[in-house]
Amino acid sequence: MMKKIDVKILDPRVGQQFPLPTYATSGSAGLDLRACLDEAVALAPGATTLIPTGLAIHVADPSLAAVILPRSGLGHKHGIVLGNLVGLIDSDYQGQLMVSVWNRGQDSFTIEPGERIAQMVFVPVVQAEFNLVDDFDATDRGEGGFGHSGRK
């Protein structure tokens, strides 16, 4: 059975002036989030700001969470990434989705009303249960890390 996520539209422009989030293709994992702005916002190099999406979600199911991720084109072409790098939306959060954007580029960038600024993906959640142990069963890799397995 497919799970449903409750989405509350906080701004009447969403679904009218600005499209609802949709999956671009049948294979898309992420929904595009749009800037729900009254007017364009100029983001100077090095600056951060919070951009409203006009949406609130309540995932409700503790086996799911949502993550907000940058859009690859904005980051690669313009240096616009998320100010917190990744946004995590816990299942019990019920507030508006705000996107922290950071201009890590060298030029000012203008975010227009309705512009796609980030994407949201729903992911399964597994909570760890900690068990205190004296050691682990031996593996070939052991404690090797940070380049231990080589480049090829």
Curated annotation (Swiss-Prot):
Cofactor(s) this protein requires: Mg(2+)
GO molecular function, one term: dUTP diphosphatase activity
Ligand binding (substrate): R71, S72, G73, N84, L88, I89, D90, M98
The enzyme's E.C. designation: 3.6.1.23
Pathway listed: Pyrimidine metabolism; dUMP biosynthesis; dUMP from dCTP (dUTP route): step 2/2
UniProt-listed Gene3D superfamilies: 2.70.40.10
Keywords carried by this UniProt record: Hydrolase, Magnesium, Metal-binding, Nucleotide metabolism
Catalyzed reactions per annotation: dUTP + H2O = dUMP + diphosphate + H(+)
Superkingdom of source: Bacteria
EC top class, as a word: hydrolase
Cystine crosslinks: none
GO biological process: dUMP biosynthetic process; dUTP catabolic process
UniProt cross-references to NCBIfam families, sorted A to Z: dut, PRK00601.1
Function in brief: This enzyme is involved in nucleotide metabolism: it produces dUMP, the immediate precursor of thymidine nucleotides and it decreases the intracellular concentration of dUTP so that uracil cannot be incorporated into DNA.
Protein name per the record: Deoxyuridine 5'-triphosphate nucleotidohydrolase
Source organism of the structure: Enterobacter sp. (strain 638)
Gene: dut
